[in-house]
């Protein structure tokens, strides 16, 4: 189990990323637009750098919903491989069964 503080930190990052999404997107468009003057683009870079570090979506980490484990996360289920295996063995995931050949 991950510490509660790590789970809370991840929730905070998601909220910040959602809050600043449109502003970041607009500034990135300005930065990549070559028809805008160099000074305006540089000001956009400085403005983007002034945003909180955790507002960047690349700072987010997928975590298991049950345990908070950050590694071996399966997006399809929202769980780590360990919890997917446990749920599959109990028959809690419809249509999923252990492979045998």
Curated annotation (Swiss-Prot):
Coiled coil: none annotated. InterPro entries: Ribosomal_uS14, Ribosomal_uS14_bac/plastid, Ribosomal_uS14_CS. Keywords: Ribonucleoprotein, Ribosomal protein, RNA-binding, rRNA-binding. It comes from the Bacteria. Signal peptide: none annotated. GO terms for molecular function: rRNA binding; structural constituent of ribosome. The keyword Ribonucleoprotein applies. One of its GO terms (biological process) is translation. GO terms for cellular component: cytoplasm; small ribosomal subunit. Part of the 30S ribosomal subunit. Contacts proteins S3 and S10. Belongs to the universal ribosomal protein uS14 family. Binds 16S rRNA, required for the assembly of 30S particles and may also be responsible for determining the conformation of the 16S rRNA at the A site. This is Small ribosomal subunit protein uS14. It comes from Buchnera aphidicola subsp. Acyrthosiphon pisum (strain APS). The lineage of its organism: Bacteria, Pseudomonadati, Pseudomonadota, Gammaproteobacteria, Enterobacterales.
